[in-house]
């Protein structure tokens, strides 16, 4: 929630903008873990999220004029997701992690199935290398689906949008400095597709900065992210624990 006020030459205040925005999520989640052997474990999970959204935005067209509603949105939907992943010790030094993730948006029955796999190599007692690949998807913010404006004829024009999708590739290097200290370096690249964009425009939800989206969008955008995360961790000893991390990111 928020608002803005203007002051005239006599320092009298008049409201310029009023925003009432509410998001509420009800979440149920459960996981089941099973260790079949020292080299084989499995994890299964399920999450149900019921989401509620309400937004009213009013703006004064001119100074000292009464506020007028320019955008409204209200609705609810559910996101259902489930996954199954396994960790298999192929040898003493090689570990395979593989799984599958799926989700369904009940608003428009859009769904996705996403495989994910990773391979880890214990090169030395202190050094590990890993390579991972996965497909990921996400729904947009609730206002994208439910906001109504005068320019759209007070209709929600984006209810049929599909998920934004991405393919992630990540490398990982881990070094055990001592029994209490660990260093991890993780470079990655992400290729995004099916990004909601405005047709015949440079607008993309990847760089949105507005309170709401008022135009029809299509899943035809692309993006690319590349970055690196570096983490130094000192484990708990004598009541002291700390972590130092840094990131570089380009989109």
Regions found by a protein language model. Give the residues of each.
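Surface-exposed extracellular loop regions of Gram-negative outer-membrane beta-barrel proteins
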Residues: 57-61, 106, 126-169, 189-215
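Gram-negative outer-membrane beta-barrel transporters
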Residues: 91, 189-191, 212-251
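Conserved beta-strand->loop/alpha-helix structural units within folded catalytic cores of enzymes
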Residues: 44, 95-102, 118-122, 171-172, ...
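Outer-membrane beta-barrel channels and translocator barrels
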Residues: 33-39, 91-95, 122-126, 166, ...
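Face-selective signature of the C-terminal outer-membrane beta-barrel domain
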Residues: 1-108, 122, 184, 243
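Hydrophobic, lipid-facing positions within transmembrane beta-strands of outer-membrane proteins
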Residues: 24-30, 78-84, 100, 113-117, ...
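Residue-level signature of outer-membrane beta-barrel architecture
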Residues: 32-34, 88, 102, 111, ...
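Flexible, surface-exposed loop regions and adjacent strand-edge segments
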Residues: 6-8, 13-22, 59-67, 114-118, ...
């Amino acid at each position: 929630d928020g608002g803005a006020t203007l002051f005239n030459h006599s320092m009298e205040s008049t409201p310029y903008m009023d925003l009432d925005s509410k998001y509420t999520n009800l979440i149920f989640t459960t996981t089941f873990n099973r260790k079949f052997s020292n080299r084989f474990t499995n994890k299964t999970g399920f999450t149900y999220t019921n989401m509620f959204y309400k937004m009213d935005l009013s703006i004064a067209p001119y100074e000292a004029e009464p506020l007028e509603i320019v955008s409204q949105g209200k609705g609810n939907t559910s996101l259902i997701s489930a996954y199954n992943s396994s960790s298999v010790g192929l040898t003493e030094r090689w570990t395979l992690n593989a799984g599958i993730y799926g989700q369904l948006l009940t608003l428009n029955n859009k769904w996705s199935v996403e495989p994910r796999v990773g391979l880890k190599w214990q090169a030395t007692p202190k050094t590990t290398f890993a390579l991972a690949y996965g497909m990921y998807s996400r729904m947009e913010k609730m206002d994208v689906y439910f906001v109504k404006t005068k320019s759209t004829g007070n209709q929600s024009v984006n209810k049929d949008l599909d998920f934004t999708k991405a393919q992630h590739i990540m490398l990982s290097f881990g070094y055990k400095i001592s029994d209490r200290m660990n260093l991890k370096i993780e470079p990655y690249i992400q290729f995004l597709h099916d990004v909601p964009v405005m047709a015949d425009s440079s607008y993309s939800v990847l760089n949105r900065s507005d309170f709401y989206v008022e135009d029809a969008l299509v899943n035809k955008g692309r993006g690319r992210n590349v970055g690196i995360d570096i983490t130094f961790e000192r484990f708990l000893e004598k009541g002291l624990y700390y972590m130092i991390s840094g990131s570089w990111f380009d989109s």
